[in-house]
């Protein structure tokens, strides 16, 4: 009798564990590898292993236009940054991120066939909170303030947490898109961003922020690859002068950069893709 009771209890507990286990796993917060890597020194990898792994871990980044880059992951996920529906090439993205500064950085009527639409702003004055995994990429945001335009009210001030920097973690790479950034970043922002191997930076010098300001951010991030965007008529020489001689410059004749964790340049490099 006692054995039978114990056996029944064990069976019931096992069944309960099977039900609770998946739910508990879903509630576990997603972990940022880029924040973890920022807090520890880089590990040396033998050259032979780097060469073997590079092809399998390659990410393709294509300049589409304005502030829109397409990021194609090894797992087949396509991401479109600052997606507005106008700047497109090839198949639709699986994920789109948006900033709400102007209509060229977002759309409220995206193609319904895009399964994941991520806004850089929240509702009712709240900051956006993005922490999601799609296929082989983990996507998160760091809220930033956005300029309030005089057409909206009489203040012309800033909307706290009204926009976002988006960070994409895939194939061992930390890729950041600064969006339509309107202000300098403080220590809290840099801590929340963590390590960025590749960063997409607006260099218009007016609509977002001054070239001095964005150059200071670029220097502090010290990413291996800097991809300019939102250029308009900004002379590239002026941007390069401001960010300093510690950055190399690499001007390409193609729109797509294929890169892996192990093919990042040893010297921080501004890579200017065709069309920028």
PLM-predicted stretches and their roles:
Residues 20-148, 173-178, 197-201, 230, ...:
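Metallo-beta-lactamase
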Residues 8-19:
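Bacterial N-terminal signal peptides
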Residues 148-221, 232-238:
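Active-site-proximal loop/helix segments of hydrolase catalytic cores
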Residues 1-4:
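Positively charged n-region of N-terminal signal peptides that target proteins for export
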